[in-house]
Structures are given as structure tokens and as C-alpha cells.
């Protein structure tokens, strides 16, 4: 479902509310369903680490991405709330907010237009999925006394949101 998810551009007459609902179902409700399923077990064991994947799009909105950006902002806010709700436990909650990561996301965003998707990464040494995985490993391998609540990672050529220098 995630790979078929289309970006909903509010100004685009061809985008539908169904596109937005799918995105909300995936990025927000999916997070809620999984958290609700695993959190009781974590509470019973007084241990665990929830790592939610946000995006710099949740910090810096960009044109044509209103709904996607809102769902990623919701990931951060939900994570903060879950952290507050579990403060009396040893459960950790981390939000990782990557910038431009070279994934199939752009192809989905541009409705299968591979050339347009490829252009997103042209001239930039984008973050790779393995880089994000390394950050997940880092935050989850900290001592019990330490919780990393938020991590924002960007390519060296990305200053903020969609502000990217292309060579």
C-alpha cells in the first residue's frame, strides 16, 4: 500500500481525498495501530523502544506536499505524546526525521514517472536507506539511562526541507 500511495496536492484537481485518506491511514493511523498493539507488552515488561519514522517534511512543509507534510508532523507530535504517556516506565520513544533519502518514494510521488523521480536525486549525494538504518541502530543501542528523543538527518547538500544544493 505504501508504494502505491500518491502524494495529494491540494491545488491539483486530479488528486482526490482518497489519496489523502490513504496517506493518513498509512502514516498516522498505521503508527497508532502498531503502537497500540505493542505498547501493552512493553508496559508489562517495563522495557522497549519505539522508533517512529518522521521526515524533515514534517518540519519544513513544501509546495504540493501539504497532506504528506502534515502526516509527518503528526508522527513527531504523536511520538512526543507517547513519550509523555510512558514517562513512568523504562520505555524509550525516538522520532527519526530524515531528509532526502534515495528510495522509491519519489517515483510514487510523481505517479510512476521514473525520469522525474530520478531528477530529485540528480546532483546530490542523497542519504541512503542504510544510513537511516545505522541511525536506528545507534539510537536503540544506548544505555538504559539515555533516551534520544529526536534525530534529524540530512544530506550534506541539504540545509532545510527542500533547500538543496545540486552540483
Regions found by a protein language model. Give the residues of each.
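Active-site helix of classical SDR
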Residues: 35, 71
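Single conserved hydrophobic/aromatic residue that forms the stacking wall/gate
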Residues: 1-6, 10
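Active-site loop immediately N-terminal to the catalytic Tyr-X3-Lys motif
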Residues: 62-66
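C-terminal helical subdomain
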Residues: 95-99, 103, 115-162
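Residue(s) in the substrate-gating loop at a strand-loop-helix junction
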Residues: 55
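Substrate-binding pocket helix/loop in short-chain dehydrogenase/reductase
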Residues: 11-24
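Active-site-adjacent segment of SDR/Rossmann-fold oxidoreductases
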Residues: 60, 81-91
